[in-house]
Regions:
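Short beta-strand micro-motifs in enzyme catalytic cores
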Residues: 38-40, 68, 100-104
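Core segments of cupin and vicinal oxygen chelate
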Residues: 1-2, 8-50
């Protein structure tokens, strides 16, 4: 079995990205330096479910709307989308129900495509 265990979201401006993710996702990120790269960690859930990750700034980290898509699990997709749009960022894929899940995609402050996922109620 292969299971995702870690993700890194590339950023050009770490402070701008931290502001975006803290405001849109209502989380507090923890700043650090990893192998010479400025980073900001997402809070990790206890237990084996889900992957932990960080925003990463460095020359090998290039934001993109193309390529691998990360789905961030949230409690309320519509609320996250509303906060992102209110903050001036783009909705790339509208909130849609797929197999008892609500999904959507937004562009973050750095030009990454970020997918959102939650259980449909």
């Amino acid at each position: 079995m292969v299971r995702a265990s870690w993700f890194e979201i590339p950023v050009l401006d770490l402070e701008r990205a931290i502001d975006f993710y803290e405001r849109v996702f209502l989380v507090e990120l923890e700043r650090d330096v990893v192998d010479g790269h400025d980073a900001a960690y997402f809070p990790a859930a206890d237990g084996p479910i889900g992957a932990a990750g960080a925003l990463m700034h460095g020359e090998s980290y290039v934001p993109s709307l193309d390529g691998t898509r990360i789905y961030l699990g949230v409690d309320d997709v519509e609320a996250v989308v509303a906060r992102a749009v209110e903050a001036g960022w783009s909705l790339l894929y509208p909130v849609t129900e797929v197999d008892d899940q609500l999904v959507a995609e937004i562009a973050d402050s750095e030009g990454n495509r970020i997918a959102l996922q939650a259980d449909a109620d």
